[in-house]
């Protein structure tokens, strides 16, 4: 499974593409998208969309993990963030990607072990987990990689849980019928 993690922002949007192999995680790409403040807002959204579309076409992820909206005190910033998130969600739907989103607390907990971790602690853990030696990595980018890792961990956990449900053995004929109603001929 290849996961594209996105830390959305109206000024800087971070992204990271990771996959899991037998040897561990593989990092395909990561960067910060900076449309520039001189273009108008719709052009910034288009720039973010176009850049992420190129990433999707290049790496063919199966899942897009996005951080849920952060609710700050500035309503205008929240509206802009919502528009960026909307464009990213549409992009995921256009490419039939599994779309999942996680709160900042969930992401921090899955990577750093605590939902109260600082951005710097998250960046440190991401670099350790993915064997990245990049002193200049933007925090938006390390957040995006953390979001991708969280998506990967949660998907693997859900798959294991579903497998457990499917492989439960019935201890009696009645339980078998209850667990498999499709086998009953009426």
Swiss-Prot record:
Subcellular location: Cytoplasm
Active site positions: 7, 67, 140
UniProt KW keywords: Cytoplasm, DNA damage, DNA recombination, DNA repair, DNA-binding, Endonuclease, Hydrolase, Magnesium, Metal-binding, Nuclease
Cofactor annotation remark: Binds 2 Mg(2+) ion per subunit.
InterPro entries attached to this UniProt entry: RNaseH-like_sf (IPR012337), RNaseH_sf (IPR036397), X-over_junc_endoDNase_Mg_BS (IPR020563), X-over_junc_endoDNase_RuvC (IPR002176)
Catalytic reactions of this protein: Endonucleolytic cleavage at a junction such as a reciprocal single-stranded crossover between two homologous DNA duplexes (Holliday junction)
Requisite cofactors: Mg(2+)
Chief location category: cytoplasm
Enzyme class: hydrolase
UniProt GO MF annotations: crossover junction DNA endonuclease activity; DNA binding; magnesium ion binding
Enzyme Commission number(s) of this protein: 3.1.21.10
Transferase among keywords: no
Positions annotated to bind Mg(2+) 2: 67
Gene Ontology BP, a term: DNA recombination
Positions annotated to bind Mg(2+) 1: 7, 140
Annotated CDD domains: RuvC (cd16962)
Role played: The RuvA-RuvB-RuvC complex processes Holliday junction (HJ) DNA during genetic recombination and DNA repair. Endonuclease that resolves HJ intermediates. Cleaves cruciform DNA by making single-stranded nicks across the HJ at symmetrical positions within the homologous arms, yielding a 5'-phosphate and a 3'-hydroxyl group; requires a central core of homology in the junction. The consensus cleavage sequence is 5'-(A/T)TT(C/G)-3'. Cleavage occurs on the 3'-side of the TT dinucleotide at the point of strand exchange.
Family of this protein: Belongs to the RuvC family.
PANTHER family: CROSSOVER JUNCTION ENDODEOXYRIBONUCLEASE RUVC
Name of protein: Crossover junction endodeoxyribonuclease RuvC
Organism lineage string: Bacteria, Pseudomonadati, Chlorobiota, Chlorobiia, Chlorobiales
